[in-house]
Amino acid sequence: MASLRKTHPLLKIANDALIDLPAPSNISIWWNSGSLLGLCLIIQILTGLFLSMHYTPDTTTAFSSVAHICRDVNYGWLIRNMHANGASFFFICIYFHIGRGLYYGSYLYKETXNVGVILLLLVMMTAFVGYVLPWGQMSFWGATVITNLLSAVPYIGNSLVQWLWGGFSVDNATLTRFFAFLFLLPFIIAAMTMIHLIFLHETGSTNPVGLNSNAEKIPFHPYYSFKDLLGFIMLLTILVSLALFSPNLLGDPDNLHPANPLVTPPHIKPEWYFLFAYAILRSIPNKLGGVLALLFSILVLLLMPILHTSKLRTLTFRPLTQFLFWLLIADVAVLTWIGGMPVEHPFIIIGQIASALYFTIFLVLFPTAGLLENKMLT
């Protein structure tokens, strides 16, 4: 008689996705980041659920309700620190995941990769609205600056901003709707993740050498389930250590002050994981141009399948493009540094050069190097 997990209508789906799934035998630790993202999403939904039980989405009490969670709620400080730092780890895993996808040519599974880019945009949106909720100085001014970018939309911009704010400035209506969005978005992300996985399981995973691995597959469980478990333990160890020993390390000290519309912080900047995009936004003097560059810095990932010119899928045997890939990583690191710096002389020009290089690598150098390597192969 067949096992229940292979016959039951619901268990069968889980079995085909997590237990009997045929997986390539040679995928490395870089393929762990997907399941780590799943773990991060679960951590964020659970900690967020418990935080929402004690939080009040009102401008007069939001800041003090967060203080109340940390002081008076049983283990509230731990839940809050796990949630705040969990967001940082979510983005660390996302950037590893995207980097893996670029390096090993995973983007050639177009449907999976397109859903992945939509997921990235959703997660960025969620992180932004979540950062506004504690109603500290940087929450308020970050919300004001970023929502104001919509005013760059021709003709309807100003109406759009006021419609989003629910008034003439970031105020109680804005905070309330952002709390509603923050409750809704993670469940949309969870649904999109399912679609992401459905598309992935249509084709199967890539592997480090970029060849078809149908000839040699191994079951996901026990091999990769245990490999993923190692990743889970490592992630949780680092996350809990950070939440216990240095919970404010990645945050902005300005956010420890309650929001004050009359006092502008000296340097308005987002959380560290948005700094590269913020630097690209700031490097263009024109408002609409900056907003478009900001959008395109993420949407350029959608063009990767079109810009893939090489006969080889992965970068494992492509030294030229490998160099460009690591140049891109270094460039994003420079942009992240510039995004946190004040807008003054050396930083402005460095940011503009780094932004130009970012788009040049994606749109010009990657395709050119691919064609050159094809010539070298023939």
Swiss-Prot record:
Which gene carries the instructions for this protein?
Answer: mt-cyb
| Residues given in the record as a ubiquinone binding sites | 201
State one molecular function term (GO): metal ion binding
Q: Which residues cross the membrane?
A: 33-53, 77-98, 113-133, 178-198, 226-246, 288-308, 320-340, 347-367
Outline what the protein does: Component of the ubiquinol-cytochrome c reductase complex (complex III or cytochrome b-c1 complex) that is part of the mitochondrial respiratory chain. The b-c1 complex mediates electron transfer from ubiquinol to cytochrome c. Contributes to the generation of a proton gradient across the mitochondrial membrane that is then used for ATP synthesis.
What does the record say about how the cofactor binds?
Binds 2 heme b groups non-covalently.
> What more does the entry say?
Heme 1 (or BL or b562) is low-potential and absorbs at about 562 nm, and heme 2 (or BH or b566) is high-potential and absorbs at about 566 nm.
**Native source organism of the sequence:** Nannacara anomala (Goldeneye cichlid)
PANTHER family recorded: CYTOCHROME B
How does it associate, per the subunit comment? The cytochrome bc1 complex contains 3 respiratory subunits (MT-CYB, CYC1 and UQCRFS1), 2 core proteins (UQCRC1 and UQCRC2) and probably 6 low-molecular weight proteins.
Q: Which GO terms describe its biological process?
A: mitochondrial electron transport, ubiquinol to cytochrome c
Topology in the lipid bilayer: Multi-pass membrane protein
Q: Where does heme b b562 bind?
A: 83
Name of the protein this chain belongs to: Cytochrome b
Q: Where in the cell is it found?
A: Mitochondrion inner membrane
User: What are its cofactors?
Assistant: heme b
Keywords, comma-separated and alphabetical: Electron transport, Heme, Iron, Membrane, Metal-binding, Mitochondrion, Mitochondrion inner membrane, Respiratory chain, Transmembrane, Transmembrane helix, Transport, Ubiquinone
